[in-house]
């Protein structure tokens, strides 16, 4: 072993420990960075060929491994567009140049156009609300936009109203009725029209149905229900054409099919009429299955997108890019897409963020180890230098 070889080995060791200290510094600096994945310096020896009686000292090589597949802790936030993944998978995001990447940094907020973008400037990509998992491709994804249009007014055109009329009821006095229920419908401007539905028994198995506008008492629809005397099932008259034309609406077909005349109380098993008033968007929720849902002021919910997750065979072999994003490579394998809670993917948690997976206690321990190792390698170099001085002084 030559003295120069000894000194070169010491320098190699110092460089290796300096690299380790650099990764430790990065980890400590990013201990609070959302979605950050810890870097770790790995060492391997470089052995030089030796001859009999002569040892040639080698050196040490370093490589940096990122714990991309290691999940960090999950903490709660107050924003529904802050997203974390519990389990496998990565969000698919788009950079300013249009390139796509993967990330676990889910601190998304709407920009001025309503597009969801994270703190590093990468836009979240999603699939259509009705997209099937088998048809997912990265090229087919679009930037998720939460500026959903307001719900337009929609006039009522159809409804289902199912009741049980007590078979023991008697026909009321002239001008009276047995039962009354109020229903809400809408004209074409989205204005509410309250409908009063009157049931009046007119025979053993016959009932008159009258639909009136509650505001003025005008009858705008009528029918006669006939029931089977043995089973109590509806035989005829199960549809009422309610004319809302005088109130700015359309003809509402109110279906009474399924109604019965049997023993018991007057009960309603179904009362649904379509139509709606105009409504503005109130907020956006994201489900565990990745559904991005617009919530409107009137309580209506509408699925805007479904957020898919991506994965690769070897996540730790992906290329790390600034902004806590990852670029799949030949070593990591091809990108595979799937929806959360299926296809081997984890679930999306709204109102949470994944923290850095760097542990301060571990990093400080590694820093002390690297510092001591650096000092030891410097002693090797120093000893080699001193021996070289001895060799030079032999000439004197």
UniProtKB/Swiss-Prot annotation:
Which species?
Brucella suis biovar 1 (strain 1330)
Query: By its UniProt entry, which InterPro entries does this protein fall under?
Result: Falgellar_hook_FlgE_sf, Flag_bb_rod_N, Flagellar_basal_body_rod_CS, Flagellar_FlgE/F/G, Flg_bb/hook_C_dom, FlgE/F/G-like, FlgE_D2, LlgE_F_G-like_D1
Please state the protein's primary subcellular location.
other
The name under which this protein is listed is Flagellar hook protein FlgE
SUPFAM superfamilies, per database record? Flagellar hook protein flgE
Q: Which family does it belong to?
A: Belongs to the flagella basal body rod proteins family.
Would the keyword NADP turn up in this protein's UniProt record?
no
What are the GO cellular component annotations? bacterial-type flagellum basal body; bacterial-type flagellum hook; cytosol
Q: List the disulfide bonds.
A: none
The alphabetized UniProt keywords are: Bacterial flagellum
The source's domain of life comes to Bacteria
Q: Which Pfam families match?
A: Flg_bb_rod (PF00460), Flg_bbr_C (PF06429), FlgE_D2 (PF07559), LlgE_F_G_D1 (PF22692)
| Gene responsible for this protein | flgE
Residue ranges of the TM segments: none
